[in-house]
Amino acid sequence: NDFEVGLVNIEQNEGRYVLPPGIERERLQGSTTVQQQNEQSVTLKVTNLPQDKVRAIYKNISVDLRRYKELKMFLHAEPVIVNGVDDDELTAIIRLGTDLNDNFYQIEIPLKISIYGSLAPLDVWPEANNLDATLEKLGKIKLARDVANAPINELFTASSSDSGELVLRVKGNPTLSQIRTIMLGVRNNSPLEKSAEIW
């Protein structure tokens, strides 16, 4: 199976890329001109991804998220071949933590497939794919795990009906004040191999 990482943007891919709903291009103010920035997204392209396997990218960062209330992300999924993947067969996975193995929060969202060929923003960026997580809930997962007396070194899943389709998990002892790495990945939930591109 193959895994490719790339970029898609409004200037080079205007035939298939549109701004997410409600997003405007940033403007760079010069001394005599105003220039619009090139809005873009990272792409993860998986080919023949086996059942329950994950492919992901990560970035080392250093950020304190305590001053923020929400984490928002727009997600797009499209088949590499026509009718090659259906809604909810793939799940986007976002990990935030001190590291990616022992101390992290994990957010999962099942992906809806975008309407092929459409340039309507809500077709390209289905509302059901919007990740909108209240960061306070991530801290509450650790408390719920401790109350449940669950092992700290195992992935704990929060049972929360107010998170919609989001699945929130925690492992170890991450803290929002010391996020050192972030991961974005995709998992195949289908018994069949799947090929798709995720933005």
Where are these regions (language model features)?
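Surface-exposed, low-hydrophobicity segments enriched in Gly/Pro/acidic/Ser residues
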Residues: N1-W199
